[in-house]
Amino acid sequence: MTENINKEYLKEKQYKSTKYLEARIKIHQFTKNKIGFHEWIFSQYDLSEFKKDNNEIRILDIGCGTGVFWKKNLNNFQNYKLDITFTDATEAMIEKQKINTAELNAKKKYEIADIDNLEKYKNQFDIVFCHNVIYHAGDKEKSIKNLKDCLNDKRSSFCSITTNSEKHMLNVYEIGRNLDKNFPTDRIIDTFTEEIADKMLPKVFKIEKKN
């Protein structure tokens, strides 16, 4: 099913600069977890097969954003041979990604690309990162299938997908509504929550869920 996602709004306002995304990322500093969100994501990966083979790992980062994931995990990736393609829908994100991955020891490519159009990346990658991006897709089912198509046929290849629970930041929205009756209540993240992902992803992937 195709949903009406306003891509022009996302490109020309929400992500034309990095400030809104960076503000949301800062919220994670208030987590109760002992390690940060981005470090926690890395800790869930099993990269032993790649390290054992000592082969180059080809990674596609879809909707790479500002590069904070890579900046936070710079040391975690230092013992791997990496060939990474970073993609995002706006120049602002790509430029910030370049800054935050400048010290990353890897072959790096930076490209403008949208999650709804991934055909050029088919069958190329060992790992696909898609962190908090699928809710921006117009056709979620098609985009999920396209993510899988981007993977190569190696036994160790995998796709890393993150999203939010439907309860995510509801308290913030409640405070906003109490302060301003015109506070926006529509949330694009609600188009692909954890609860929706639990139903959609198993149709395409063999799932290993981490909470």
Regions found by a protein language model. Name each.
Residues 119-127:
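A short acidic, Gly/Pro-enriched loop at the edge of an enzyme's catalytic core
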Residues 206-211:
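Conserved S-adenosyl-L-methionine
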Residues 1-52, 68-69, 158-183:
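Conserved class I S-adenosyl-L-methionine
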Residues 189-204:
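Short alpha-helix
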Residues 126-139:
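A short SAM/SAH-binding and catalytic strip from SAM-dependent methyltransferases
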Residues 141-157:
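A short glycine-rich, Lys/Arg-flanked "PGG" loop and its adjoining helix->strand segment in the class I
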Residues 58-117:
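Class I SAM-dependent methyltransferase SAM/SAH-binding core
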